Amino acid sequence: MSVQSAIRRRTAPDIRARKNGDPIVMLTSYHAHTAALVDRYCDVILVGDSLGNVMHGFETTVPVTLDMMILQGRAVMRGSQQALVVVDMPFGSYEASKEQAFHSAARLLKETLCGAVKLEGGVKMAETIAFLSARGIPVMGHVGLTPQSINTLGSFRAQGREEGTWQPIEDDARAVAEAGAFSMVIEAVAEPLARRITETVAIPTIGIGASPACDGQVLVLEDMLGLSPRAPKFVRRYGELGPMIEAAIEGYARDVRSRAFPGPEHVYAMKPKS
């Protein structure tokens, strides 16, 4: 048996069992190399549709396609061994009907070999979540700020910060949990509301701009590494790789133009005659 096959990958039931337990650590990844690094420390790797922003420069996640998610999901699965890999269902791949959602989710599982899918929406998507869950597809929910709805929302502002706005978000969270999701992301929601949802739903909550009381946390990898020029309020920078990478590229360009690179140690000499 190979070393890789001997390593047990985390599953959706493993994450479901972490409710009120040790905090769940989750980060995004879109490449095999970063997936290998993230895999060492994280319980869950999210192949997020945020790849549209990070990799392709889109202003929103709306243009992301199912084929794009499959391509990067495959890369992350090849680069990781231990973490549960969850792949986002992109806008337009699941909203039309339960059947459309099943066919899209089945493609994601079959073609990437990931362990679960994530979709946005609460009450309106509960029937779809139940349909998928009953057919062997683990679903991670996503409530609060739902970026795929940007054209309806108008902006990426935090939710539940005004009195009288909590009930719809609570209803969404409850509907997702009762429909059979194994966990849910709570994004950009007022801290007291995120805390209350975490205390009342039976499945783990994973916060992003939510509350330290959530059962876990997630960030976009490039945001926390300092690779994004701008980051939301809820991001803590754990590195400043952007300036480091720029300095390295500047040094490379300088050495090429001055012919300092390549040096003698970087080129191949002729083999001696026998």
UniProtKB/Swiss-Prot annotation:
The terms describing its cellular component in GO are: cytoplasm
Q: Which residues bind 3-methyl-2-oxobutanoate?
A: D49, S50, D88, K118
Q: Which UniProt keywords apply?
A: Cytoplasm, Magnesium, Metal-binding, Pantothenate biosynthesis, Transferase
Active-site residues per Swiss-Prot or TrEMBL entry: E187
| Catalysed reactions listed for this entry | 3-methyl-2-oxobutanoate + (6R)-5,10-methylene-5,6,7,8-tetrahydrofolate + H2O = 2-dehydropantoate + (6S)-5,6,7,8-tetrahydrofolate
Q: Name one Pfam family in it.
A: Pantoate_transf
Its subunit composition reads: Homodecamer; pentamer of dimers.
According to the record, cofactor stoichiometry and binding are noted as: Binds 1 Mg(2+) ion per subunit.
Indicate the family of this protein.
Belongs to the PanB family.
Q: Which GO terms describe its biological process?
A: pantothenate biosynthetic process
Pathway listed for it is: Cofactor biosynthesis; (R)-pantothenate biosynthesis; (R)-pantoate from 3-methyl-2-oxobutanoate: step 1/2
Q: Give EC number(s), comma-separated.
A: 2.1.2.11
Q: Which HAMAP family does the annotation name? A: PanB (MF_00156)
- What is the purpose of this protein? Catalyzes the reversible reaction in which hydroxymethyl group from 5,10-methylenetetrahydrofolate is transferred onto alpha-ketoisovalerate to form ketopantoate.
Q: Enzyme class, one word?
A: transferase
- This chain belongs to the protein called 3-methyl-2-oxobutanoate hydroxymethyltransferase
Q: Where in the cell is it found?
A: Cytoplasm
Q: Which GO terms describe its molecular function?
A: 3-methyl-2-oxobutanoate hydroxymethyltransferase activity; magnesium ion binding
What cofactor does its activity depend on?
Mg(2+)
Recorded superkingdom: Bacteria
- Its main subcellular localisation, reduced to a broad class, is cytoplasm
Residues annotated for Mg(2+) binding in this entry:
D49, D88, E120
Which gene is transcribed and translated to give this protein? Answer: panB
